[in-house]
C-alpha cells in the first residue's frame, strides 16, 4: 500500500481544523493510501504555550501585574483545558507521525512517503508575524518527491506582488494543486501555475458519512449559535431570532469567557458531539466557514453572518451552493 503524508493545521483548538483533518485522512484511505498526518505543531500553537505567547503580544493586557493576572485567569481554561481535550481527540482519531516542532532539529522525524501533500484549511496564508510558514508548502519533503495540494487555502483573496513572487517560489515543486476557493485559483494562476477548485474535505466526505459519527444529545428545540468572532450585533441578532422563533438559544464555543454572552453555554464539546448539535438544531447562526459547511450538509436552516475579515471562504461556499441569500 502506498503512503501519503500530509501537513495541515490540525493542532489548533478549533472544530473545523480537527474535522477537516479527519476527513482528509479518511478520504485518502478511501483512495487506497496509508495516510499519515505530519504532527507538525508550531510553538505558538502548542496549547500550553498559547496563553503566555498571546499575552506578550497584547498591549492591552500586558500593562501590569494585575492585567496580566486577569488575562491568565480568563484565557487559561480555553488554551489549556480545551487544548488537552482536543489533543486526546487527535490521538484517538488521527494517524499522527512523531511530533515535530522545529523542522531543522526534528528533520530525522520526517516520515518517508510516496506522496507528500499540503492539506486543507488556511495553510498558505499569513500565520505568524504576517508571514507564511514554508512547512505548509512542503519544505520538509525530499526534493524529488511527488508533491500535491488538496483543497488548500490562502485565507484571503488579495496579496501584493511581493507575496505573489514568494508564492511562485514556494509552489514551484508541486506536481498537482487543488484549492478550496475560486480566489485561490486566481492566486495560484498569478504565481504562474495551474490549480483546480474543489470542495473542502469535510464536504467531500459528505453528510451521510458524518451522520454515522453523531453522538446522542438530549437538547431539542433550539437555535444553535456558533460564533468565532466577537460581534455584539451578532449576539443581539441571535437573541432576537431565537425569541421570535420561540426557541431557546444555545452557544457552543471553545472559549470559556464566552459564557458571559447570550445563549445557554456549551464549552468544549467533543468534535463529534459538536456535529450532533448542528445536525439536531432547528436553526443555526454562524460566522464560521465549517459551521456553514455542516449546516449545508445536514440540511439545516441557517443564517450566515460574515466576519469582518477573511470572508473569502465563507462567500465561496455559499456561491458554490447558490445560498448567497443566507447572508
Feature locations, PLM:
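A donor-sugar binding/catalytic signature common to diverse glycosyltransferases
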Residues: 277-317
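Leloir-type glycosyltransferase catalytic cores
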Residues: 320-327
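Donor nucleotide-activated moiety binding/catalytic core segment of transferases
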Residues: 195-203, 207, 254-287, 292
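Aromatic- and Gly/Pro-rich donor/ligand-binding loops
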Residues: 6-15, 19-169
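Acidic anion/phosphate-binding donor-loop and adjacent secondary structure
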Residues: 157-162, 203-216
